[in-house]
Regions:
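Internal amphipathic alpha-helical repeat/solenoid segments
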Residues: 109-122, 143-146, 151, 155
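Short, well-structured secondary-structure segments
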Residues: 130-137, 172-176
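Generic anion/oxyanion-binding catalytic loop in active/binding sites
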Residues: 3, 106, 113, 148, ...
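Cleavable N-terminal signal peptides of Sec/SRP-targeted secreted and luminal proteins
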Residues: 1-14
Length: 433
């Protein structure tokens, strides 16, 4: 298993992003909150071949938002302008004191890794870490998002330096193709992840990256946390691009786009590059409050994890009970949630490993279907769980253990790449021991 720790946190407000993602945690005491043996879980020592690493995302650390021919991405527009996309047209304008992000923060400079990449790699080496997961900026490589419109040589040069620099320092690169920063032109021209056109666009972009970097990169991730960037950016509208009500359509297209990129690698590059490629999914662990709540907790897991994991790892189809609940709720585009036989065959087994991001655990109970309980479950957090640095994050190590067992049992996955840690709230770096 591989664990990634963030090297540099979000340049844009982490508090704002995670308040939108998690919501202010609902704290409620319950008998299940108190289990001393469980809560003081100690997993023992890590195996000798365990790989320690750090992870970043291009928009969160690079800066250089207009440097050397880079195109705008949806986060550039979301942070620089106040407004949202309607019918694929961005109605944003100069913020005039109103912003989509707390404090009108942007990632124009961020951690300045576009300039300071050597310093960052030296830090990773000095920490004794063995791997570095970073993402490529689609708009830095393809300013309009389209291969047909030409590529940006400066962007290719930057990532060549980063990859070669990592390898020269004995650091194994894990490269993510998409970490939420869609080229703005693809959003404005056809609606980004709400359109089937994104499938071919993403596959062509992936092909470009495999061709230019795959001679040295042997570990690829297609999409990072699709449930987060879709649910927050295309349903609630609180993240880029600020679209509302398009959740299930956009979710559907992420699976098809991922599978298309995987098949490009499988058919054109695997034999000569000998790498591996997969998708990274994000989920909380959902613990039932009582035995009567187990079905509700399972529904949460199937909606947040199984929505992608079952088609990819089990049978090429969505969980039927999840689709039924979505239709019962009357959600828009629920009718789109099915695959043709050809699509199903493309999706099934389209990941060489189970990529997992996990930060949080919750207690789940059932509730009657209503406007405030659309899917039959609700969740809360225990006030006695240890508080981490961010206000929304609590330390629940046994939740990760339960989650890993769930993945092993339900998806028969032996190979898990995992991202997640708990910070104590300090920016200091402490020496070992």
């Amino acid at each position: 298993m591989i664990v990634y720790w963030w090297l540099c946190y979000h340049a844009i407000s982490a508090e704002q992003i995670h308040e939108n993602l998690q919501g202010p945690s609902i704290l409620r005491d319950s008998p299940i909150c108190h289990n001393e043996e469980r809560d003081h879980f100690d997993g023992g020592a890590f195996p000798r071949d365990f790989i320690w690493a750090v992870a970043t995302a291009s928009h969160q650390i690079e800066g250089g938002w207009r440097a050397d021919g880079k195109g705008n991405n949806i986060w550039d527009e979301f942070t620089h302008y106040w407004g949202v996309y309607n019918n694929n047209e961005f109605n944003g304008r100069s913020n005039q004191g109103r912003c989509n992000i707390d404090g009108c923060e942007t990632a124009d400079v961020a951690c300045n890794s576009y300039i300071q990449w050597e310093r960052d790699l030296d830090l990773i080496k000095d920490m004794g870490l063995q791997s570095y997961r970073f993402s490529l900026s689609w708009a830095r490589l393809l300013p309009t998002g389209s291969v047909a419109d030409g590529f940006n040589q400066a962007g290719v040069d930057y990532y060549n330096k980063l990859i070669d620099g990592a390898l020269d320092r004995g650091i194994l690169p894990f490269v993510t193709l998409y970490h939420w920063d869609l080229p703005a032109d693809l959003q404005s021209s056809f609606g980004g992840w709400t359109s089937r056109k994104i499938i071919d666009a993403f596959a062509e972009y992936a092909d470009f990256c495999f061709d230019h970097f795959g001679d040295r990169v042997v570990n690829w991730i297609t999409l990072n946390e699709p449930n987060v960037f879709v649910d927050q950016g295309y349903e609630l509208g609180v993240m880029a691009p600020g679209v509302k009500g398009q959740k299930w359509l956009a979710r559907h297209h992420t699976i098809l786009a991922h599978a298309a990129a995987y098949r490009v690698y499988d058919s054109k590059y695997r034999a000569r590059q000998n790498g591996q490629i997969g998708i990274t999914l994000n989920t909380d662990w959902s613990e039932p409050e009582t035995e009567a709540d187990r079905d509700a907790a399972d529904m949460f897991m199937d909606m947040e994890l199984g929505f992608w994991a079952k088609p990819i790892f089990v049978d090429g189809q969505y969980p039927e009970h999840v689709v039924d609940v979505i239709k019962r709720a009357g959600d828009a585009h629920a009718e789109a949630l099915s695959f043709s036989q050809e699509e199903s065959s493309q999706i099934l087994h389209s990941s060489d490993f189970f990529g997992l991001n996990h930060y949080y655990s919750i207690i789940t109970n059932k509730c009657e279907f209503s406007d405030t309980c659309r899917y039959g479950h609700s969740s809360f957090s225990c006030p006695n769980w240890p508080q981490a640095g961010p206000y929304w994050l609590k330390s629940v190590p046994w939740g990760l253990r339960h989650l890993l067992n769930h993945i092993h049992e339900k998806y028969n996955s032996e190979k898990v790449n995992s991202d997640g840690s708990v910070s104590a709230g300090s920016s200091e770096i402490y020496p070992p021991n």
